[in-house]
């Protein structure tokens, strides 16, 4: 037998059986440290959270035939609106019943929530609340 040839018994004896769960490098995942986006205390749990661009309020129960101008007229009383997003139903072309209204400052968004919640817009009482809130601190256990 030459130097290039190997006995089958030697190969079988030195082989490791893989269980098909990824590379061996993935076992070191516990040692990797990740950046934390935002540390939240229990005191700020449920508090509003700023989006990347501004403070967004979530308006629900909007009449299906409302237009962007109707929503803009209603919510521009509380401050300068940066953006309004209305989702349309593709099949009917009507609103899905909610809107996202973005303000520059938290004060303007707070005023919009406090003064326009449960008010009338085209014959329906709209509900207004924060779009993003800080969640509860989890222990990491399931």
Swiss-Prot record:
It is found in: Cytoplasm; Nucleus; Nucleus speckle. Keywords: Cytoplasm, mRNA processing, mRNA splicing, mRNA transport, Nucleus, RNA-binding, Transport. It comes from Caenorhabditis elegans. Belongs to the RBM8A family. Its main location: cytoplasm. It comes from the Eukaryota. Disruption phenotype: RNAi-mediated knockdown results in embryonic lethality due to developmental arrest during morphogenesis. RNAi-mediated knockdown at the L1 larval stage results in increased sperm production and no oocyte production. Expressed in somatic cells and germline cells. GO terms for molecular function: mRNA binding; pre-mRNA binding; U2 snRNA binding. This is RNA-binding protein rnp-4. Residues 55-133 form the RRM domain. GO terms for cellular component: cytoplasm; exon-exon junction complex; nuclear speck; nucleus. GO terms for biological process: embryonic morphogenesis; feminization of hermaphroditic germ-line; mRNA processing; mRNA transport; nuclear mRNA surveillance; positive regulation of oogenesis; RNA splicing.
């Amino acid at each position: 037998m030459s130097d290039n040839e190997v006995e089958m018994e030697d190969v079988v004896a030195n082989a490791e059986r893989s269980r098909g769960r990824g590379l061996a490098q993935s076992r070191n995942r516990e040692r990797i440290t990740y950046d934390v986006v935002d540390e939240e205390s229990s005191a700020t749990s449920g508090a509003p959270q700023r989006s990347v661009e501004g403070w967004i309020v979530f308006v629900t129960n909007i009449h299906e035939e409302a237009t962007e101008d109707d929503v803009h007229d209603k919510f521009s009383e509380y401050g300068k609106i940066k953006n309004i997003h209305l989702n349309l139903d593709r099949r009917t072309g009507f609103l899905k019943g909610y809107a996202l209204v973005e303000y520059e400052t938290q004060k303007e968004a707070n005023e919009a929530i406090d003064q326009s919640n449960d008010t009338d817009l085209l014959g329906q009482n709209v509900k207004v609340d924060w779009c993003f809130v800080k969640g509860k601190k989890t222990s990491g256990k399931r």
